[in-house]
């Protein structure tokens, strides 16, 4: 009986040893597998990031080629044709985009500074009423009125704030300070109940314009201006009102126009694009889940990443910014690949420098998403 118990004990010890060996073996194999997977992932991401830096460099180069002698940035090639300050601001924002191994150059920094000189000069000259300009006989001529004063002012402040943040510049030219002050006063004059209207003559309030104004104020606030407190108060007013005025809770979607439930599901612009505009401009929606639903619906309905439908005369590369916010790497990669395939060499219509600006920013955002992916895996 005693001998039988001893044998049982020996068998248990042997089983335990075997079990431990198996566990150690499995852990070793698992670690080896994970290490190999990480190495392959790192290699794949390195390749992707180098590609993004190549695209970023080439797009910046093209934008720079389209800057005029006074700092203005033209919409498309040959330094001729139209200068639209709204889209020029986006092109200049593209020049500020960078990655870990592809920093903003001194040339790019100076180009954005020159553009801000030009834009601010026109802003002060027109008392904040920017227009669209055309080059005729070597001179820029006022062509037509801007379609939304509030949106144009918002994009100017967006660029100004981002430039000051990136360059850490605190010693602003005096006329820049005047330009910023004028833009802020104009925005306040267009505000009704915490929301901006299109212009003094047009009292319509648009979701997209207000998000652009909010973004401009937000970036200017981040830059740490002297009157940050005043900027913050205006920004908070708009932020508080955007969801109250524009969110249609009954239909679970964004209104395009304040107090109007008109919506055409099949229309890409403005109906569809408005649903992802808060994502594009990084607006802090209170319930993030609802924005994900709208993004998924937009992607399924319009297949924006394919870039195969020219809507209202634009490529709408801006859509990739929403993908970046959602961490949608695959669709963002597809968008940039399709853009590169279709427009990289020929730069054909309807490509504008503003579209290239969004691509630059998206290259930077996608690079960051890859960095985050590696960090998460390491943890």
Stretch-by-stretch model annotation:
Residues 40-90, 97-137, 171, 177-188, ...:
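Low-complexity, Ser/Thr/Pro/Gly-enriched N-terminal "stalk/linker" regions
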Residues 105-108, 112, 173, 231, ...:
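Solenoid-repeat scaffolds in large eukaryotic assemblies
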Residues 309-314, 318-377:
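Fungal-biased detection of long, low-complexity, Ser/Thr-
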Residues 8-26:
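N-terminal Sec-pathway targeting helices
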Residues 131-143, 192-203, 343-345:
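Acidic/His metal-coordination segments adjacent to aromatic residues that form catalytic metal sites
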Residues 232, 289-302, 331-341, 373-379:
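Alpha-helical repeat scaffolds
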Residues 54-60, 70-86, 146-150, 174, ...:
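Extended ligand-binding clefts on enzyme/binding-domain cores
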Residues 46, 89-106, 154-172, 212-227, ...:
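Well-ordered alpha-helical scaffold segments within catalytic/enzyme domains
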